[in-house]
UniProtKB/Swiss-Prot annotation:
Family of the protein in this entry: Belongs to the neurexophilin family.
A GO CC term assigned to this protein in UniProt: extracellular region
Protein name stated in the entry: Neurexophilin-2
Region ranges (III): 91-169
Source organism: Bos taurus
């Protein structure tokens, strides 16, 4: 059997493919201006680095291209640890910032439902307005703020009490005894301020007469913490011709954004 040589037409095609591939490699290395092209083994090194500069687009944000100074620093093993220390010092504050707990700015679940308190009491010689607001701090503590304005003669007292507090006009010796529930009442006055002003004005019951009136404005801040069960608002007003004692215990199982309204 006589063997015939293969046609030479195939060889130029193979050579053309090889030249095309080599051109692609050379074109890929043209963008790497920070590499020494005259050094030996440059082609292999450039091919490896070209993969780093042109990675697969697996991330939305493109990886930053290393600066020339970074690679030159890393080439020397003596200066590598200094370079790594400098990079670490820059990245440590960012890492600490990322480790901080994220504070949610949205609404968190309150410990109880009621938030605002409003009480308006009007008589012939008295006009009393009491407003209250509770602020849940979200860390197991909450504050209760009271403000009341009264026009007339008398003393007003607004406080937080446990449910066992007896509603009565006069303080009896039995009501001062400490119970188990009152001992676990973890609420205290944090701030208190009272402003009083005296003036004369026309009487409500008889506009032809001049009456002596006293205006009182009070701000009280309570701070409560766990453990606690139920707290109540206790209002007491004493004047010459009018007495009022009221205890309001909100329902903790009912969550509502509307304020509690009390009138009398």
């Amino acid at each position: 059997m006589r063997l015939r040589p293969l046609p030479l037409v195939v060889v130029p095609g193979l050579l053309q493919l090889l030249f095309c591939d080599s051109e692609k490699v050379v074109h890929a290395t043209e963008g790497l201006d920070w590499e020494d092209k005259d050094a030996t083994g440059t082609l292999v090194g450039n091919v490896v680095h070209s993969r780093i500069i042109n990675p697969l687009r697996l991330f939305v944000k493109q990886s930053p291209v290393p600066k020339p100074g970074h690679l030159a620093y890393a080439d020397s093993m003596e200066n590598f640890w200094d370079w790594l220390a400098n990079i670490t010092e820059v990245q440590e504050p960012l890492a600490r910032t990322k480790r901080r707990p994220i504070v949610k700015t949205g609404k968190f679940k309150k410990m109880f439902g009621w938030g605002d308190f409003h009480s308006n009491i009007k008589t012939v010689k008295l006009n009393l307005l009491i407003t209250g607001k509770i602020v849940d701090h979200g860390n197991g503590t909450f504050s209760v703020y009271f403000r009341h304005n009264s026009t007339g003669l008398g003393n007003v007292s607004v406080s937080l009490v446990p449910p066992s507090k007896v509603v009565e006009f006069e303080v009896s010796p039995q009501s001062t005894l400490e119970t188990k529930e009152s001992k676990s009442f973890n609420c205290r006055i944090e701030y208190e301020k009272t402003d009083r002003a005296k003036k004369t004005a026309l009487c409500n019951f008889d506009p032809s007469k001049i009456c002596y009136q006293e205006q009182t404005q009070s701000h009280v801040s309570w701070l409560c913490s766990k453990p606690f069960k139920v707290i109540c608002i206790y209002i007491a007003f004493y004047s010459v011709d009018y007495k009022l004692v009221q205890k309001v215990c909100p329902d903790y199982n009912y969550h509502s954004e509307t304020p509690y309204l009390s009138s009398g």
